A protein has these predicted regions:
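Carbohydrate-active catalytic/glycan-binding domains of CAZyme proteins
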Residues: 1-544
Length: 544
């Protein structure tokens, strides 16, 4: 059986509301103050594995491309992005994904020298049973293989390689009209790129009574099999529960202290805690990554999306995991880490578009149209070629964005764009989805070149500010400044004198009001209804 508290982890929990995203190290010790989230912004549904001294982590990505960001850490707290598991259209067709479609939760595992990432494209059925598939590689920075589709229903698939070579795929499915955890075994042929199901899918566990059992993970620890899942929905009732048995098939002995993690009904900065995954460090200590939200305001809404967090795990005398101190996730706590801190070089806040390809932070909305984006047409600039789709159309606009990662953020872009006709438009948008966004843009209205701020809230769209421009041939700097309560929009022609022209309340871009499973992006975009639209050129984009 597992030894209780194998790493001697000590906790000093705190619910301080600092905006720190990493930690401070105490002198002469590995005890550090860790501030959750460890990966801020819309990076939900984390899954983790370890290879030697290195940790790798994957998250879901929904309708954004490339999909499934892959992160690397050597201390569990400082993470750098290596790339994406799904960076080709052949791996990730998103034509019919829509808002919060596309890629749901992944599981990332390492087995016999190879990484496996298994997930669901809920908008694409690659097998008779739906959109579950896996990709694999020997290098987590890529490239990853083409999808191997799995004939098993549901979402949130887990892949487990047992000691006898059996490969178990466990997912959240439906049986007899109920959501429950289901499972089958597969034979993988990586050379042929096929996976053959060996048996009918069987019901595995209904959970403990919370709605929507999902996010299953199976572990073999000291000869005991543990099945850990999420329940309660991914909102404030979210929780992690666990059971164990002598086989990956059960029968299951349910933990008497379930849920082992939940902040439900607690006055804590972090909410919706759940969807956990376990990893053991070289010193035999155990850790869990999970998602959480940071709601604000009287209505307790969040705009940053579900974010990746960390907590230590100890094992009690009965062999059950204890997450954190009492199954709660703190925003800030002092923990003894299994490694010395290993920070990565700071990424530049500004992208000058001087490289021959975009960095890992950038995402397209759905699959991009290749001819709509160019880094070589005007060297040192990113050129966007407009499409006729509006931001509210629900289709594929020319759109390129980065996640909002903090409450207080300033995002600025320099735009060179001369609109010719009504409908020609380019600018900077704070984006939740097609129905909820705020943008500042250069366009033409009533025959005059203007700067506008538009608010789209559900089916209501309104230009709330309009400033006539005397010389649209000159580049303009566009800025969005954020706080917990508002997005504020400003412009400048020289970078020194700024004019704020409008604002919008943050809550209308929140997941509770306007979204489903994603967080806010800041994106540059270009629109036009003309047959030969003028190009939109961006010299740089900066997020601080």
């Amino acid at each position: 059986m597992i030894s209780p508290n194998p790493a001697g982890i000590t906790l000093d929990t705190s619910d301080g509301r600092s905006n720190g995203l990493h930690m401070r190290q105490d002198s002469g010790s590995r005890a550090v103050v860790v501030c959750n989230p460890v990966i801020p912004g819309f990076y939900p549904d984390p899954s983790i594995c370890r290879v030697g001294e290195d940790y790798y982590l994957a998250t879901s990505s929904f309708e954004y491309f490339p999909g499934v960001p892959i992160f690397h850490s050597r201390d569990l707290v400082h993470w750098r992005q290596l790339g994406h598991a799904l960076d080709r259209r052949s791996q990730l067709p998103l034509d019919e994904s829509g808002t919060s479609g596309g890629i749901y939760a992944p599981t990332l595992r390492y087995h016999q020298g190879r990484f496996y990432m298994i997930t669901t494209n809920v908008s694409h059925h690659g097998s008779p049973s739906g959109g579950n598939f896996l990709v694999h590689t020997t290098d987590p920075s890529g490239p990853w293989s083409e999808p191997i589709w799995l004939d098993q229903e549901g979402i949130d698939p887990d892949i487990f390689f047992d000691h006898d070579g059996t490969v178990y795929v466990t997912s959240s499915g439906r049986s007899d009209g109920r959501c429950r955890i289901v499972q089958s075994t597969f034979t993988l042929d990586l050379e042929r790129g096929v996976a053959e199901r060996n048996e009918p899918v069987v019901d595995l566990w209904d959970g403990t009574g919370g709605r929507g059992p999902e996010a299953p993970h199976i572990y073999s620890i000291d000869g005991v099999y543990y099945l850990m899942i999420a329940e309660g929905g991914t909102e404030d009732g979210h929780m992690v529960t666990i059971a164990r048995g002598s086989s990956p098939r059960g029968p299951w002995d349910v933990c008497p202290r379930n849920p082992i993690l939940s902040n439900r009904s607690l006055d804590r900065p972090l909410q919706a805690t759940g969807h956990g995954d376990l990893v053991q460090s070289p010193d035999r200590s155990w850790w869990m990554v999970m998602l959480a939200t940071r709601p604000t305001g009287y209505h307790r809404v969040h705009v940053l999306g579900r974010e990746t967090c960390l907590a230590p795990v100890r094992w009690d005398t009965e062999g059950w995991p204890v997450v954190g101190k009492h199954g709660e996730l703190p925003h800030e706590a002092t923990w003894r880490l299994p490694h010395r801190l290993q920070r990565w070089p700071e990424e530049p806040a500004r992208d000058d578009f001087d490289a021959d390809q975009l960095g890992h932070k950038w995402n397209h909305l759905y699959n991009p149209i290749p001819d709509a984006y160019s880094l070589v047409e005007r060297p040192g600039w990113l050129t966007l070629h407009a499409r006729s789709e509006s931001l509210a159309s629900g289709s594929r606009p020319t759109w390129l964005g980065q996640r909002q990662t903090a409450f207080d953020q300033v995002v600025t872009a320099l735009l060179d764009f001369e609109p010719q006709d009504e409908g020609d438009e380019a600018g900077l948008v704070a984006w939740q989805n097609h129905e909820h966004h705020y943008e500042i843009a250069r366009t033409v209205r009533s025959g005059n070149p203007v700067l506008i701020v538009r608010r789209q809230i559900g089916s209501l769209s309104a230009v709330v500010s309009e400033i006539e421009e005397t010389d649209p041939s000159k580049p303009v700097q566009l800025r969005v400044s954020t706080s917990k309560t508002h997005y504020r929009f400003a412009y400048s022609h020289d970078g020194d004198a700024w004019a704020e022209i409008a604002s919008g309340e943050s809550r209308y871009l929140s997941s509770e009001v306007g979204g489903l499973f994603t967080g806010v992006y800041f994106a540059i975009y270009s629109l036009s209804g003309s047959k030969e639209p003028p190009p939109s050129r961006f010299d740089w984009f900066e997020a601080t």
